[in-house]
Amino acid sequence: MALPDRKPMLQVEGIKKYFPIEKGLFRRVVGQVKAVDDVELEVRQGETLGLVGESGCGKTTLGRCIVRAIEPTEGRILLRLDGDRMTDLLQLGKQDLRAQRRHMQMIFQDPYSSLDPRKTILDIVAQPLRANRMGSSSEIEDRVRDLVELVGLNVESLIRYPHAFSGGQRQRIGIARALATNPRIVIADEPVSALDVSVQAQILNLLQDLQAEFDLTMLFIAHDLSVVEHVSDRVAVMYVGKIVETAETEELYLHPLHPYTEALLSAVSVPDPDIGQDHMILPGEAANPADLPSGCYFHPRCRYAEDRCRTETPAWTEARPGHFARCHFAGELELTGVDA
């Protein structure tokens, strides 16, 4: 369920992340990899925004730019820290940024490499609390106990090390760590992609329960639209560094406006053997972010492409109420969706 009346918690404006291509002994810059290219996003308070796209489209890079794990090349990242005041995180110095990091936390993709194998679960979950001096030792330990129980683990787990836990249990520990500081926004970077399907469902249900209980604001990054469908209020689709479509979840699944979204939706399995599915196979590979095509980046793979798609860059258009797409023919093409 979308929350149109909520104030934005996060606004990403014109974010770019270009990596230089260097060549020769003197490392001369000969080009750029446009990993994130002029992205605009808004995540409202208490909302889960799903960010989807193929591997290599720039989703994770964008998430890391938002928390300033890597520095963007250009743009603004505005986070609501106090009342109605939005703070541009890119204008903060190192000391101020460190003080504000507790307001933005990440849940990482790999539950095996994201936990320090030399530390107990108590120390892992307590680390952000200690780093931000959020209480005495006893208060921090009490907080960690509450968090561990909240994510479905026993308090006896606190003295154990990560190797003693399964992948799903490790991801629960990662979630507890992310929630420790009561962040304003959580960036969940493919939090279930490394897990078995049955465990995925458990973690998704946990995230939904936590979001409902604590009114969490979350950017949920994934490559699987069937996963995003169950946790997101709205969905943004990313292709080669650009957002190509965004809408409320049900609206986007039923009425896609961009051919790339239609192709992604065709891969979503329908749990009914009587319903035939026409899986759309996109020709070729995704565009090279170091050598992007002219016009619409998607035109070499698009079955609907016309001459203008090869020469003109499509504008960001609101073709239906609250439903935006970057396509010359948004709202004109009859694209196939699925029931959300």
Which positions does each model-derived feature cover?
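P-loop NTP-binding/switch modules centered on Walker-like glycine-rich loops
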Residues: 68, 184-187, 191, 195, ...
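Conserved ABC ATPase signature
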Residues: 161-165, 169
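Conserved ABC ATPase "signature" region
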Residues: 84-88, 138-156, 265
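The feature captures the beta-strand-to-loop junction immediately N-terminal to the Walker
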Residues: 52-53
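ABC ATPase NBD Q-loop/coupling interface
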Residues: 76-99
